A protein has these predicted regions:
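N-terminal charged helix/coil linker that caps or initiates catalytic domains
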Residues: 1-43
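Glycine-rich phosphate-binding loop and adjoining beta1-alpha1-beta2 segment
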Residues: 5-10, 65-106
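Conserved N-terminal Rossmann-fold NAD(P)-binding element of oxidoreductases
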Residues: 44-46, 69
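Aromatic pocket-lining residues of Rossmann-like dinucleotide-binding sites
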Residues: 58
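A structured beta-alpha segment of the ubiquitous adenosine-cofactor-binding alpha/beta core
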Residues: 95-132, 136-145
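E1/E1-like adenylate-forming module used to activate ubiquitin-like modifiers
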Residues: 129-208
Length: 208
């Protein structure tokens, strides 16, 4: 049964499922805010440690629409920290595994998957109609990361980022009207890839 058939023929059942699945959110959020979450569309770049947990957490919170991107497959080395990495998913595409996991949590969640590297060929589609973007890209994916922030800023989309330095965590938000990603991390086009990565790491822990 395709998703569209499920949605068309069982919408009443889906509404009841959604209400029951999110009823314990009320108090943390209002019913009006829960309705907004259901209509929201979030783009998550990277389905590894951070992105996988972001997706499953947001699905459980009741967010109804996602764009997810990752070109990689799960490996044994991922099992210590990535939500979708299990013995049964080794070698499988991360976007496919995480999409299936999301639909198992909320059967009618809307997902659009991008299984190639984020680049000029797909960045506008990835951000199309999105309310918020989440940067969970690999530390080495700086060209894709810079493109993500630049296009999101141009489209008026906030980008949330987080990182786990040591046994702590950092979180930041780049809003369109605030300091740009390039300015905050002091990135310049004449920097080498290593210099860009080093500046990014330092910027994640400015007090460290």
């Amino acid at each position: 049964v395709s998703f569209s058939t499920f949605e068309d023929s069982r919408m009443g059942e889906w509404d009841d499922y959604y209400d029951q699945a999110t009823q314990r959110n009320i108090g943390l959020v209002t019913r009006e805010e829960q309705s907004r979450l259901r209509q929201a569309r979030i783009a998550i770049a990277g389905m590894g440690g951070g992105g996988g947990l972001a997706l499953t957490t947001l699905v459980r919170m009741g967010v109804g629409n996602f764009h997810i991107a990752d070109f990689d497959t799960f490996s044994i080395a991922n099992t210590n920290r990535q939500a979708g990495a299990m013995s049964s998913t080794i070698g499988q595409p991360k976007v496919e595994v995480m999409a299936a996991m999301a639909r198992d949590i909320q059967p009618a969640v809307q997902l659009t998957s991008f299984s190639t590297v984020i680049g000029m060929h797909n960045i506008d589609a990835f951000l199309d109609g999105v309310d918020v973007a989440v940067d969970s890209l690999d530390i080495f994916a700086q060209p894709a990361r810079r493109l993500l922030y630049a296009r999101a800023r141009a489209k008026g989309i906030p980008v949330v980022f987080s990182a786990p330095p040591g046994f702590s965590a950092t979180i930041g938000v780049c809003v369109p009207e605030g300091m740009s990603f390039e300015a905050y991390f002091d990135l310049r086009d004449d920097m080498t890839p290593f210099q860009i990565m080093a500046a990014f790491i330092v910027g994640l822990t400015p007090a460290g």
